[in-house]
């Protein structure tokens, strides 16, 4: 049922479209053949009898029924004529004092212009009345001549003549010839030679082109018009007015035709072309959100460690300002000389980057280590609270020149320093991190970063660390272990990276206090026990200084994030929304284009595979056909020829069998 309804609806729609197209074609046809109605007006006169009966007609035309009119025997009329009762026709004598208003006078002059303008033009052109009447007669018989084309008009305009007519009794041999157009009035219309026929406006007679007349011709034309009841200067002024009106009507009609042309279902493309043509010369201004500049925000304060580490983590190459001189640790005792050297290195780095060195904090890391922490390639965990609300997994890839300087904590319990990002501790700040680092590390005590964890040396007697994180380190050189001296628990296990190392970390955080941040946290904390069982128990209280730092930075970071969100105006919100929509659309278009390219490539591959398979089939069929022909030929040849010796026939048959098996083997099929 639904299919029948759809079929009927399609049929009706097709009929409606056909009717519309037919109506448009009919309208175009009538517009094409439309002409001036005055051209179809014809007056025919012929002699006819008043009385159909011949006897009555003879009696009526006999001189007996004729009588002189008003006693004049030269003027005989029928006695049954009504004019016989007009005994006297008085002459009209206008009054001497006639009061005519200016409006009536102007109307009378306009009427005289409409009545006699054809005669004025004929008098100006020097054309007699007989020539005009004969031309009208020719036009009534054969119709008006076709309008000249544009090229002919230009040629004739150069010769100062539009269309030349030859009259039988024409004796006018002037250069100026006339163009003609039939009039609606009884007066004949003939024009001057330099007048151009108006093609579009049929209501206005063919006018003299007043723009091409000089002053003498204008004065002569006005003088000719004064004899027909017009004031001096009226004729040329009214001609100009008629020309302006004709141009206005022509323009309006062209606009109407253009609108009619670009209407309907079939001309959407034409309407679009017309719109593009109209907008081609117009300068289109960009939209408001694209015209305005980006809004500028007041700078807000951030912690120096956050800003510096964030800027460092985004750059993949070391900036020239941060390329520093590499210093090597020569003593591991945490002596005063080492602290002084670390402070000097921090001052040098601060002078290089234009920032003052950070003062050493009690209970925190040593000054040398604090200076080296600012040179690391990613955000430290103390500055990670700015991105505390992000819930996505972050990957940061950074390549920077990093090294670790300074000494370690001097621990009274002889515990080695461990990373705070312990993946299996049961504290609230648990993080699971995976890191993959590539590069060369030449270390004196084993390579280790913030995502590599090593057990205490109680289990291992040397410096080689055992990693509990899932990390793979590919290095051109093997890790060279240092000398195993006496049990020196405060010795350093730090390493230097002489080449920029790329590391990717996937950090998962389960606690709300520590965020998922784009960082390779390399901070270290003190542990209170070297043995693994004591480690797990003492892990929550392992780093009191870092915990205090985190507690202090949490509210500060909250304030910063609160202050870092300026209120957006509706225009800026709209701009952001528009930019997001544009980015989304651009990504969708790009994705669609890629999918289309992939699909086209897939189709091309399928076509190639099909062609290859068809070629393979054709070759196989050709090979089979050749083998059949060869077998037929061999069979016929063996019948016709004499049978050879048994030894020869045996060798021949074996060679044939061997060649046939080779040809049929799949290795030879392509």
From Swiss-Prot:
Q: Post-translation: what modifications? A: Phosphorylated in vitro by CLK4.
Q: Spans of biased composition, class Basic and acidic residues?
A: 290-313, 586-613, 621-637
Bias (Acidic residues) occurs at: 182-214
Q: What positions are modified (Phosphoserine)?
A: 101, 285, 294, 331, 335, 543
Q: What SMART domains does the annotation carry?
A: DRY_EERY
The cellular component terms of Gene Ontology attached to this UniProt record, alphabetical and capped at eight, are: nucleus
Biased composition regions of type Low complexity, renumbered to the chain: 340-355, 378-400, 492-529, 638-647
Q: Spell out the Pro residues composition-biased ranges.
A: 356-365
Instruction: Specify the domain of life of the species encoding this protein.
Output: Eukaryota
Q: Which key words are in the record?
A: Coiled coil, mRNA processing, mRNA splicing, Nucleus, Phosphoprotein
Q: For this chain's UniProt record, which GO biological process terms are given?
A: mRNA processing; RNA splicing
Residues modified as Phosphothreonine are 327, 569
Question: Per its UniProt record, what Pfam families does this chain match?
Answer: DRY_EERY (PF09750)
The family classification in the record reads:
Belongs to the splicing factor SR family.
Assembly and partners are described as: Probably interacts with CLK4.
Name this polypeptide is given: CLK4-associating serine/arginine rich protein
Q: Where does this protein come from, organism-wise?
A: Bos taurus
Identify the gene encoding this protein. Answer: CLASRP
């Amino acid at each position: 049922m639904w299919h029948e309804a759809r079929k009927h609806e399609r049929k009706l729609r097709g009929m409606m479209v056909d009717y519309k197209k037919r109506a448009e074609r009919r309208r175009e046809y009538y517009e094409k053949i439309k002409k001036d109605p005055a051209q179809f007006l014809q007056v025919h006169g012929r002699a006819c009898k008043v009385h159909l009966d011949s006897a009555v007609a003879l009696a009526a035309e006999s001189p007996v029924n004729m009588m002189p009119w008003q006693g004049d025997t030269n003027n005989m009329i029928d006695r049954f004529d009504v004019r016989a009762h007009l005994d006297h026709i008085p002459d009209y004598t206008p009054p001497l004092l006639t009061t005519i208003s200016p409006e009536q006078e102007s109307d009378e002059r306009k009427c005289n212009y409409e009545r006699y303008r054809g005669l004025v033009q004929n008098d100006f052109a020097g054309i007699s009345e007989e020539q005009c009447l004969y031309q009208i007669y020719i036009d009534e018989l054969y119709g008006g001549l076709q309008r000249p084309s544009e090229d002919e008009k230009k040629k004739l305009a150069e010769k100062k003549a539009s269309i030349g007519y030859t009259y039988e009794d024409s004796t006018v041999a002037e250069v100026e010839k006339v163009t003609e157009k039939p009039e609606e009035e009884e007066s004949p219309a003939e024009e001057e030679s330099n007048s151009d026929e108006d093609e579009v406006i049929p209501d206005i007679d063919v006018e003299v082109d007043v723009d091409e007349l000089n002053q003498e011709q204008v004065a002569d034309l006005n003088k000719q018009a004064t004899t027909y009841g017009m004031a001096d200067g009226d004729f040329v002024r009214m001609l100009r007015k008629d020309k302006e009106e004709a141009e206005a009507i022509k323009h309006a009609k062209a606009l109407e035709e253009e609108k009619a042309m670009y209407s309907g279902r079939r001309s959407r493309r034409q309407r679009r072309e017309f719109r593009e043509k109209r907008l081609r010369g117009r300068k289109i201004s960009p939209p408001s959100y694209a015209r305005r500049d980006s809004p500028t925000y007041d700078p807000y304060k951030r912690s120096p460690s956050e800003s510096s580490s964030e800027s460092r983590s985004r750059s993949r190459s070391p900036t020239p300002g941060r390329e520093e001189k590499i210093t090597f640790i020569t003593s591991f005792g945490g002596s005063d000389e080492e602290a002084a050297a670390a402070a000097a290195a921090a001052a040098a780095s601060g002078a290089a980057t234009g920032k003052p060195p950070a003062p050493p904090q009690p209970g925190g890391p040593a000054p040398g280590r604090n200076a080296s922490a600012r040179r690391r390639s990613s955000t430290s965990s103390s500055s990670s609270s700015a991105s505390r609300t992000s819930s996505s997994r972050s990957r940061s890839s950074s390549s920077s020149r990093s090294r670790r300087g300074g000494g370690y904590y001097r621990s009274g319990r002889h515990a080695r320093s461990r990373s705070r990002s312990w993946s299996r501790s049961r504290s609230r700040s648990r993080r699971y991190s995976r890191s993959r680092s590539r590069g060369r590390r030449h270390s004196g005590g084993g390579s280790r970063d913030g995502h590599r964890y090593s057990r205490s040396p109680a289990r291992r007697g040397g410096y080689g660390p055992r990693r509990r994180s899932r990390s793979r380190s590919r290095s051109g050189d093997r890790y060279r272990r240092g000398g195993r001296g006496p049990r020196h628990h405060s010795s350093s296990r730090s390493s230097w990276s002489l080449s920029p190392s790329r590391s990717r970390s996937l950090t998962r955080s389960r606690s709300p206090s520590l965020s998922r941040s784009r960082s390779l946290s390399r901070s270290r904390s003190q542990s209170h026990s070297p043995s693994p069982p004591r480690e797990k128990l003492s892990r929550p209280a392992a780093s009191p200084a870092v915990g205090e730092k985190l507690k202090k930075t949490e509210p500060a970071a909250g304030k910063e994030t609160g202050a870092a969100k300026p209120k957006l105006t509706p225009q800026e919100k709209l701009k952001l929304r528009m930019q997001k929509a544009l980015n989304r659309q651009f990504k969708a278009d790009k994705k669609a284009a890629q999918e289309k390219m992939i699909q086209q490539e897939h189709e091309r591959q399928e076509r190639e595979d099909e062609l290859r398979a068809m070629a393979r089939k054709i070759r196989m069929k050709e090979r089979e056909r050749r083998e059949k022909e060869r077998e037929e030929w061999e069979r016929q040849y063996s019948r016709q020829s004499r049978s050879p010796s048994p030894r020869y026939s045996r060798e021949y048959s074996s060679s044939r069998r061997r060649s046939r098996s080779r040809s049929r083997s799949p290795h030879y099929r392509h």
